[in-house]
Amino acid sequence: MKSHVRSFKTYIRDEIIKKGGWVNAHAHADRAFTMTPEKIGIYHSSNLQQKWDLVDEVKRTSSVDDYYARFCQSIELMISQGVTAFGTFVDIDPICEDRAIIAAHKAREVYKHDIILKFANQTLKGVIEPTARKWFDIGAEMVDMIGGLPYRDELDYGRGLEAMDILLDKAKSLGIMCHVHVDQFNNPSEKETEQLCDKTIEHGMEGRVVGIHGISIGSHSKEYRYKLYEKMRKAKMMMIACPMAWIDSNRKEDLMPFHNALTPADEMIPEVSLLP
């Protein structure tokens, strides 16, 4: 009798478990499981920037207990899938204040023997507006990594670079890493990854900064991409490929290299990797 042939999925799962299990490096667990049939139409017709504010309703009406329930459900789902380390952004801003992060810490205490949990503060309201800045400063003391969204302050005030300064100053003062959403919109006019590299070196944060998404990198010319990889190497910058933001990209007539939603890791790894 022939031995049972495992599926490719099973093979990959087993091999990853042998090496210590999956790592989910980027999530927003505080807002998980909040989509409803009534909201689908609104979200379907809205772009990513609009969704940054559409979630205000959920944030405003969620209690610590509501957030705690969603964190627990998210964590248990990760554990069931073989995830051993889970990094999630947590909203801390004028809308939800500190309710989500209080719930996050409560959940981490419950699951501390089952999974490694790390938190970064999500700054959907930016860090320039005074009340948003207040909650950024409060939240920074309650997380493991500083999180940021410079494009919010670029969109609202034209001050995206200043937002990067604030994020990196805070991370450096606290001695922790900084995870920053960059280049999400599949647009060759976006150069946030390069800007973040420059700011990382300026602030002496080499090796402690992570870019998230990087979708627009692939929309640039090959010459630009390889110059960027050299900057990333100098900044010792890491990237988290998170292609889901692509789903919000509208049809456009810009001419650009043909590419998919993934950060161009096939090019990036040999050019940026610090491993021998």
UniProtKB/Swiss-Prot annotation:
InterPro entries: Metal_Hydrolase, Metallo-hydrolase_Enzymes. Keywords: Signal. Residues 1-29 form the signal peptide. Belongs to the metallo-dependent hydrolases superfamily. PANTHER family: CYTOSINE DEAMINASE. This is Uncharacterized protein HI_0842. It comes from Haemophilus influenzae (strain ATCC 51907 / DSM 11121 / KW20 / Rd).
